[in-house]
C-alpha cells in the first residue's frame, strides 16, 4: 500500500483502490434529554426551592464547593480540572454554567427561604435515558432532611417532567448513615 503522498486530510491511497464512489463525511452526535431544555427550571417543594445558580450565589456556592470535608463524599475534586490555573472567584459558577451550556449537567441551587444551602446535580448521561444525580447540603443545614427533600424533588422532575428512564445515585460506603 502506498502512503498519503503527504496530502493533508485526504488519503490518496483510498483512490488507488479505484472506488466507484467516495461518499461525504457524516457527523453524528449523541444527544440527551437535556438538549430540550432552554434554561434550568425552578422546582418547588414544601420547604425548598430548586433554582438556577446565579451570580449572587458565588460566595455561598464557592464555600460549598471548597468544603473538603463535605466534598470527599462528592466523588470529584475540582483541583483535577483546575490544574495549574489559578482558582478565581467565579470558577465554580462558570463551570456549572458551561456544563449546562454543553448539556453535560444541570445544577440546581437548593434554597431555603431564598438562601442557597446546597446543590443538586444531574450529570454523567449514559445516553440510554439515564443520568447520575448528586446532592450536597452545607454542613450548617445538614440533619434536617433538606438533602432528602431536594434529592427527591430533582429525581421526580427528571423522571416525570424531563422524561428520563432512570436516575442513578451512588454513595460511598463510608458515607452511609
Features from the language model and the residues they span:
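Conserved beta-strand-loop-alpha-helix junction that forms the acyl-donor binding cleft
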Residues: 2-9, 169-177
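Aromatic (often tryptophan-rich) hydrophobic motifs at membrane interfaces
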Residues: 1-30
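GNAT-family acyltransferases
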Residues: 32-140, 156-157, 161, 167
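Conserved acetyl-CoA-binding loop-helix of GNAT-fold acetyltransferases
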Residues: 1, 137, 143-160, 176
Amino acid at each position: 500500500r502506498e502512503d498519503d503522498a503527504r496530502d493533508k486530510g485526504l488519503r490518496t491511497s483510498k483512490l488507488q483502490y479505484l472506488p466507484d464512489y467516495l461518499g461525504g463525511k457524516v457527523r453524528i452526535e449523541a444527544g440527551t434529554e437535556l438538549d430540550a431544555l432552554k434554561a434550568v427550571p425552578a422546582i418547588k417543594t414544601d420547604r425548598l426551592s430548586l433554582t438556577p445558580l446565579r451570580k449572587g450565589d458565588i460566595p455561598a456556592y464557592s464555600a460549598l464547593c471548597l468544603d473538603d470535608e463535605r466534598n470527599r463524599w462528592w466523588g470529584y475534586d475540582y483541583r483535577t480540572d483546575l490544574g495549574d490555573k489559578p482558582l478565581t472567584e467565579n470558577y465554580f459558577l462558570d463551570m456549572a454554567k458551561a456544563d449546562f451550556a454543553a448539556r453535560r449537567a444541570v445544577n440546581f441551587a437548593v434554597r431555603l427561604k431564598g438562601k442557597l444551602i446546597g446543590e443538586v446535580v444531574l450529570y454523567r448521561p449514559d445516553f440510554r435515558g439515564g443520568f447520575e444525580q448528586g446532592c450536597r447540603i452545607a454542613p450548617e443545614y445538614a440533619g434536617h432532611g433538606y438533602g432528602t427533600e431536594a434529592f427527591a424533588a430533582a429525581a421526580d422532575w427528571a423522571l416525570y417532567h424531563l422524561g428520563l428512564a432512570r436516575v442513578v445515585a451512588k454513595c460511598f460506603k463510608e458515607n452511609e448513615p
